[in-house]
A protein has these predicted regions:
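Secondary-structure boundary/capping motif
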Residues: 1-2, 115
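A short, flexible beta-alpha/helix-coil linker loop
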Residues: 10-11, 85-87, 124-127
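Helix-loop-strand module that forms the ligand-binding subsite of alpha/beta enzymes
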Residues: 66-116
Length: 181
């Protein structure tokens, strides 16, 4: 089985970049292995539709992003099967969130969507550009980390901690990392 951890988001808009920042954090701090499965981590930025050729190569997809949820405050973490989204998830967030939803729906229509899970956190809405995470999203990082590690372990993946780099130290160079991929 091929497993993809896909970080989505716009690093120029604070919390909207949490998926990208978190995938960079995992890349720097963990080594994932399984004797039979391939595990890849990708910074998908705001590419959405352009990711389709990549996404079709995987059997199991975990999208890490912000999610909009009606009546829920910033910093709430959700982990769900894309086919069974909680009722409060309204997909009315940023442009990249809507595009990713459309991408997954298009892939489903043609039978190319892998089994998909969403690991999302509700963002603080900020209008001006700002590279960094708000305090509520930063406080949610351990919950996000625990959710992804538990899910991978359920799949039999070994999650080995190889570093202890803070997510905030990775943010200033996030835009460069996406270009290197």
């Amino acid at each position: 089985m091929k497993i993809l951890l896909l970080g989505i988001g716009n690093v120029l808009y604070a919390d909207e970049g949490v998926g990208v920042h978190f995938v960079n954090y995992l890349t720097e701090n963990y080594r994932f292995s399984h004797p039979e499965h391939q595990i890849d981590l990708v910074d998908g930025g705001t590419l959405a539709h352009s990711l389709i050729p990549t996404l079709t190569q995987y059997d199991h997809l975990i999208v890490i992003d912000t999610v909009n949820a009606a009546g829920v405050g910033a910093g709430e973490v959700y982990f769900f099967d894309f086919d069974k989204a909680p009722a409060e998830i309204d997909w009315q967030g940023s442009a990249h969130e809507v595009e990713m939803l459309q991408t997954l729906i298009m892939m489903e229509l043609v039978g190319d969507r892998p089994k998909t899970f969403v690991l999302g956190v509700t963002p603080t809405v900020l209008e001006p550009m700002h590279m960094g995470l708000t305090p509520k999203i930063h406080a949610a990082i351990p919950v996000i980390e625990s959710a992804i590690l538990n899910h991978l372990r359920e799949l039999g993946v070994t999650c080995e901690r190889i570093n202890n780099i803070e997510i905030n130290s990775l943010i200033p160079t996030a835009y460069k990392r996406g270009m290197e991929a």
